[in-house]
A protein has these predicted regions:
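Alpha-helical scaffolding within the catalytic cores
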Residues: 60, 188, 226-233, 259-275, ...
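N-terminal secretory targeting modules
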Residues: 22-207, 217-220, 238
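Structural recognition of the beta-strand scaffold that forms the well-ordered cores
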Residues: 75, 203-208, 212, 242-248, ...
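Bacterial N-terminal signal peptides
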Residues: 8-18
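Glycine- and acidic-residue-enriched helix-capping/strand-helix junction motifs
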Residues: 214-227
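C-terminal outer-membrane/trafficking sorting elements
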Residues: 418-430, 434-508
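Catalytic His-Asp segment of secreted/periplasmic serine-dependent ester chemistry enzymes
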Residues: 290, 328-416
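Oxyanion-hole/transition-state-stabilizing segment in secreted/luminal serine hydrolases
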Residues: 38, 213, 217, 249-304
Length: 508
């Protein structure tokens, strides 16, 4: 028997290797998470921005948008949040846009919803498509074409698209171009695109108003300041894995009034609950300040804005998101300006700049103000006294310090420095090989339902180490393999949209 032992051991080893490879393929031996590459903030569409005739019911709508980061798998979210009745999408296609209403038909893919082509969104709800393989490259223009069934008289959308959409009668979702279509510079129902990306990938979410939304930028030019910021991130090797989510709404207020849901009411939806957000930029408040007309109102509005910002900070830190405040830019020459609104603006900006409040400051006021009249925008950067022109947007987007978005281990929360867990991490077990016990460590960046299971080489569960809701933190679990045979095993961490599998070896 001695002469046969090495051969038997070799066969067993090869068998384990083969089974290991098969199981690794089955459960996914890669670390991927869902990360936002594009968003637009849904709102109730005002009467003047409704879809033009022939309307959406039983017709096709082609909408073009530019993503930030790329990926090979995506999913799309659609919103009917502000409509009062159901909206049916009979068919939805996504393709590479080649300019105007034209698409590359070889890239056209149908989106499905729980395996179905048709989906009906109830009033007040949103839906997300099934994941599909799609070769999405950074800053790619894509076209989403929807063939509608019944639609609502109240429409959910985003009026400030700065991008042309196309409406044509009937079902033309697979048509190369929409020749003869009615055009409109608004988006309807589309809300977000996520990509499946390595766990090191992340995104920045921006809460803003019309200056973030790009009023005064070029229609179809993709030259809002968040677009310029995205370009800068993608050019730098240390930040090219970071997406940008522009959640600006024109006319939006932080506190009350204005257009769309207020910043306070939409903050969770648009910022902390977006997929893959590691940083947030708050650049909103000018529409609240613009209504100030007395010293008392200046004091009250400044205090209320600061209290809202504090809420934003608390919520961001609870999700381990670094949050940066952007100072309010000048607006002398616009109807918003008076001595009291200027006092309010300066009070708010002083708080934003003060260390220990936000995790950092992006000082747009400093770079955009006229040195000869600091209440005004630089003459060559302004559009109407309030909104920058394209040169101003380029200045804003290119001025942001990219070091704010490199991987750091700590951030300052008030006066305390705390360890920040940036991403899901599954460590290699130790010791490995082991007999009979080993320890597995893992980290979760935000409160998540966590599953940590051990599998044998055939994919059968042999132990469940964790199956419950855990707060953000780093954890370790010991696995005692007493009574199990020597060989290769696998452990898999499932938390939120994160999945990772690793191998461990029991050697007796």
């Amino acid at each position: 028997m001695k002469n046969f032992t090495p051969f038997v051991v070799m066969l067993v080893s090869l068998e384990f290797i083969s089974l290991s490879q098969s199981f690794a393929t089955l459960v996914g031996d890669t670390t991927k998470i869902w990360v936002g590459t594009w968003t637009t903030a849904p709102q109730l569409v005002e009467p003047g921005n409704m879809p033009p005739s022939p309307g959406l019911t039983n017709n096709s709508l082609r909408q073009v948008l530019e993503v930030s980061i790329g990926g090979d798998t995506l999913r799309v979210r659609f919103s009917n949040e502000f409509s009062t009745s159901t909206v049916t999408m009979n068919s939805v296609q996504i393709a590479v846009s080649t300019g105007g209403s034209t698409i590359d038909t070889s890239t056209n893919r149908e989106l499905k919803f729980n395996g179905n082509s048709q989906v009906t969104m109830s009033a007040g709800t949103a839906v997300t498509s099934d994941p599909i393989a799609f070769n999405l490259t950074p800053r790619m223009d894509v076209a989403i074409t929807i063939y509608y069934g019944q639609t609502s008289s109240s429409v959910t959308g985003h009026p400030g698209s700065r991008t042309t959409s196309y409406i044509i009668a009937g079902n033309t979702t697979t048509t190369t171009d929409f020749t003869g279509a009615v055009t409109t510079d608004h988006w309807y129902n589309i809300s977000a695109i996520d990509v499946l990306a390595p766990s090191t990938t992340a995104c920045v979410a921006i809460l803003g108003n019309s200056i973030a939304d790009g009023r005064g930028s070029t229609t179809n030019g993709q030259n809002r300041w968040p677009d310029i910021f995205s370009e800068a991130l993608l050019r730098d090797s240390s930040t090219q894995h970071i997406g940008v989510l522009n959640q600006g709404i024109g006319g939006n207020c932080v506190l009350f009034g204005g257009l769309g849901p207020t910043g306070v009411s939409r903050y969770d939806r648009d910022i902390v609950n977006q997929n893959g957000v590691r940083w947030a930029i708050i650049f909103e408040g000018v529409n609240d300040i613009g209504g100030v007309s007395s010293s008392t109102a200046a004091t009250n509005t400044a205090n209320n804005l600061i209290n809202a910002y504090k809420q934003f900070i608390t919520k961001a830190h609870a999700k381990n998101i670094r949050i940066y405040g952007a100072t309010i830019t000048p607006f002398k020459g616009n109807g918003y300006y008076n001595q009291y609104s200027e006092l309010c603006r300066n009070t708010v900006n002083q708080w934003i700049r003060t260390a220990g409040n936000y995790d950092g400051c992006i000082d747009f006021d400093k770079i955009m103000r006229n040195p000869l009249d600091t209440a005004s925008l630089v003459t060559t950067y302004q559009n109407d006294g309030l909104h920058p022109d394209t040169a101003g947007y380029r200045k804003m987007g290119s001025s942001i310090d990219l070091n704010l978005f490199t991987a750091l281990d700590t951030t300052t929360l008030g006066v305390h420095s705390v360890r920040i867990i940036d991403s899901y991490v599954l460590g290699q077990n130790y010791p490995n090989p082991f007999n009979p016990a080993t320890t597995i460590s893992f980290s979760v960046p935000t409160q998540s339902f966590v599953s940590l299971k051990i599998y044998d080489a055939l994919g059968r569960v042999v132990s469940i180490l964790v199956s419950k809701l855990l707060s953000a933190g780093t954890y370790s679990r010991q696995w005692d393999a007493k009574g199990l045979a020597s060989g290769v095993y696998f452990y898999r961490l499932l938390a939120g949209s994160f999945i990772e599998t690793k191998k461990l070896v029991l050697l007796r």
